[in-house]
C-alpha cells in the first residue's frame, strides 16, 4: 500500500503540468501513488502517453460544459477522487498544474507523521511563492512560513487566506471525522462564489477537528503564471502590491455580506 496519495489536476497547461508531474516523479520518498485528472484537452491529444511509471494513473475529468460553467472544477475533481475509494495512501496531498513540489516534500511529511507515531491528522509546511516570467523562468518573490500550530481546534493560527492548498497534507482517516461533523461528503466546496479561497474553507474545517501541525521546511513553490486564476500577479513590486490590495479588498467585501462557511 502506498504511504502517500497525491491528486494532480490538469487544465490545458502542457508545459506547466509536465513540470508539476516531474516534481512528483522526482520525490526522494518513493512509496506513493498519483491520480492525474485532466480536463480532456491534453488527454484527448494523448499528451500523457509518455508517462510509463505505474504509480501514476491518468484519467479525464469527464466534466460537461454546464459543470465547468457552474462549479469549481478543481474542487469537484478533488471530491470525486476522495469519494471514489481508489486512493490507498495514509496521507493525501494535492497538486495543480501551476505548482511544483520540491524533491523532499513527500519524505518530510511522511517522516514527521511517522516520527509522531502516526498521530497527526493534518500538517502544513512552508512554501515559496514564485512568478513565472515570459521566458518561463520562476522568480521567487516571497514565502509562506509554517510557524506554529494552526486551526481553531488548538486555538492556533488562521488557515484561510494564509495557507495555500499545496502546503497542506492530511490523513485519509480524517475524512471520516469530517463526514460525521459536517454531514457531507463534499469536502472541498464547489461553490464558485468561494473560488478565491475554496482551499482555505477546507483547511479551516479540518482545523476545527484537529491540530494542523507546522513543518517549517519549504516543500513547494506556488507559481503565478499568465493563466493563474487565484491572483493577477505582476513581476514588479508595485504590481504585486496592487494585486494584493485588490484581493484583500475583494475578500473584505465578501466577508461583510456573506457569513463564513466554516
Question: Which residues make up each language-model segment?
Answer:
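Nucleotide-sugar donor-binding/catalytic module of glycosyltransferases
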Residues: 1-262
